[in-house]
From Swiss-Prot:
Organism name: Shewanella baltica (strain OS223)
Taxon lineage: Bacteria, Pseudomonadati, Pseudomonadota, Gammaproteobacteria, Alteromonadales
Family membership: Belongs to the PlsX family.
Its biological purpose: Catalyzes the reversible formation of acyl-phosphate (acyl-PO(4)) from acyl-[acyl-carrier-protein] (acyl-ACP). This enzyme utilizes acyl-ACP as fatty acyl donor, but not acyl-CoA.
Pathway terms, separated by semicolons: Lipid metabolism; phospholipid metabolism
KW Ion transport (keyword) present: no
Superkingdom as given in the UniProt entry: Bacteria
The protein's name in its UniProt record: Phosphate acyltransferase
Record gene name: plsX
GO molecular function: phosphate:acyl-[acyl carrier protein] acyltransferase activity
InterPro entries: FA_synthesis, Phospholipid_synth_PlsX-like
Length: 342
């Protein structure tokens, strides 16, 4: 396997090095070809490296900085003033080809702003999109984009999102011709606003995207499609609502299984199965949102991710780097534009 280097914003997120460094060590154990650059306060990072094995330490580099982008920093402010922050330096390592991807659990708005300015978008891409996968009843992931990078989008941007989401699904899941749908208020062709209607027209006229039509919100988790496209306003609300419902279901299930002696006894008998179901619904299992459409790979972890969840984000970055995702998106867009022009 070709060696890969990842840059980690070690200070990002609610827990900083307490989570990012142990997760990095676990990633190195899993991937013998991997090298990791930890960007952040060396004194804090070293605390979590004291007991690490020598063969793992040999594949770790630390770039020291004591500047951090806070969760309260506005994106423009962070972009202008946090020029030596752990987040920015990690992205710059990707820009300068010192790393093939970067991962951060820090301020989402600042991460998107810095990544777009420092890495630039790919040719044929107007705006990058934030995408993540969701669970489905078929036990295969469903990719949803955009999750908030772009509050409003025109039809051309939605079309580009569909292309990028399709390529991502092919790259990460090795799925041939993934099914792509536009999230809408109905499945009928007459439904939806102008942007969605026009995006549908664009998608219907390219054979390189397996476009299946509109999909409604109640079908998101059906597994009938592989990629669901919408603007960032709709996508972010959809994601947050889904996470809230998952928490509600877990709460109600736990409360229901502790009421009454017989129910508690029954709960103990089926506890392993319940735990397996709850694990599938846990957002940490799907941690890692990709900012796609850029000339480099950037993965956003949940800010409150634990070690296992952060490891999932690292693994996603590794997979995207192995598949050379930006190059795949660039090639597909060029091919589609060539078909349209002919």
């Amino acid at each position: 396997m070709t060696n890969l280097t990842l840059a980690l914003d070690a200070m990002g997120g609610d827990h900083g090095p307490h989570v990012t460094v142990p997760a990095a060590l676990r990633a190195l154990q899993l991937h013998s070809f991997l090298k990791i650059i930890l960007v952040g306060d060396k004194t804090e990072i070293d605390v979590y490296l004291r007991q690490a094995e020598a063969n793992l330490l040999s594949r770790i580099e630390i770039i020291h900085t004591d500047e951090v982008v806070s969760m309260s920093d506005r994106p423009v402010h962070a972009l202008r003033t946090r020029k030596n922050s752990s987040m920015r330096l990690a992205i710059e390592l990707v820009r300068d080809d010192c790393a093939q991807a970067c991962v951060s659990a820090g301020n989402t708005g600042a991460l998107m702003a810095m990544a777009k300015v420092l890495l630039k978008t790919l040719p044929g891409v107007d705006r990058p999109a934030l995408v993540s996968c969701l669970p489905a009843v078929t036990q295969k992931p469903v990719y949803l984009l955009d999750l908030g990078a772009n509050i409003s989008c025109d039809s051309e941007t939605l079309f580009q999102f569909a292309v990028m989401g399709s390529v991502l699904c092919e790259a990460v899941d090795k799925k041939s011709r993934p099914k792509v749908a536009l999230l809408n208020v109905g499945i009928e062709e007459i439904k939806g606003n102008d942007q969605v209607q026009q995006a549908a027209q664009l998608l219907q006229h390219t054979d390189q995207i397996n476009y299946t039509g509109f999909i409604e919100g109640d079908e998101i988790y059906s597994g009938n499609v592989d990629v669901i496209v919408c603007d960032g306003f709709v996508g972010n609300i959809t994601l947050k609502t889904s996470e809230g419902i998952a928490k509600l279901l877990v709460h109600q299930l736990k409360r229901g299984l502790t009421q009454g002696l017989f129910v508690r006894f029954l709960a103990k008998l089926i506890a392993p199965r319940i735990q397996a179901v709850l694990s599938q619904m846990n957002p940490d299992h799907y941690n890692g949102a990709s900012l796609i459409g850029l000339r480099g790979i950037v993965v956003k972890s949940h800010g409150n991710a634990d070690e296992t969840a952060y490891l999932q984000a690292i693994s996603l970055a590794v997979t995207e780097a192995q598949r050379r995702l930006p190059e795949m998106i660039k090639d597909r867009l060029e091919s589609i534009l060539l078909d349209i022009n002919h």
